[in-house]
């Protein structure tokens, strides 16, 4: 079992698959270009959230965070009403939200700060200044983002700036850290991407960025400074030397499931309860012909399809203690990927790689930020 319903502490919610950006390493689009054809464009309403989450569960949760695999939560029509409802049910609940910040009005952001209150935060993903932020956060408006962040902070909101490092912006890390402190952000994190990796787990040094018509516009490149590179990607070559092939490594590595440790689950915008966002990002888009995607979809079909995971039709308890979650956890004991060990689990939560843990470079917590 991945998690017992009675032990749940954390929930990641993707309220919508809508987003105004075109980030080249996001599964929502084709390398920064057009939206992938098979993605369902949908969102969860306040009424659906109320139906999905029993108040007894909300009252005992420690953290709910809105972080989309495919969408940005601020694009959801009911994001404020949903947060208001969660806060009413559990005043002590920590509520977080990850966004590029390039939508809504300053007035709306002031209201968001008031609704989140003392036990809430917003992570603004800002990867540079007016000259560089749009290189990765395509189709966003830097000046609007800063205005929105200022409005949120001015109204008392706890703001965190998360800076994803590439070659085109690595020279700005220290400057943006200082800028974030001046603006009133309570924390700054520079982050190393682990996504210079193909669906077949081949390391690439640069990634093409496409227009919506599919033409190459430019390339994203890894940082030159080793300090800003995700060491897990560098480690793959060593693992291949030790195990002959990366597939052999995946066959042998023990899996230490992060969501099992955190007692966490994931709710998708189409209402599905699944173990984590790292499986969710293999459901649609460019990776659907990968082994990881095929494995997960095969399991979904084995247990009766998406309908059996739909939290609008079945209780969270029924789903997390049901067949899919059991089959995923049972797969970890299989000897090889070909025998049913979940490849995606081995890549993300294999104990010898730890791509997620190795994303953080520097975390600055300012004096006024004493919660985290």
Residue ranges of each PLM-predicted region?
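Flexible mid-to-C-terminal extensions adjoining Fe-S/redox cofactors in radical SAM and related proteins
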Residues: 1-9, 29, 33, 272-273, ...
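Processing junctions and N-termini across compartments
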Residues: 13, 17-20, 251, 339, ...
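Radical SAM enzyme [4Fe-4S]-AdoMet core and its adjacent flexible, acidic
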Residues: 6, 14, 29, 34-44, ...
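Non-transmembrane alpha-helical segments in soluble domains
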Residues: 53, 83-85, 150-153, 177, ...
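A residue-identity detector for tryptophan
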Residues: 75, 85, 108-109, 185, ...
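Conserved alpha-helical substructure of the radical SAM core
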Residues: 1-121, 135, 139, 143, ...
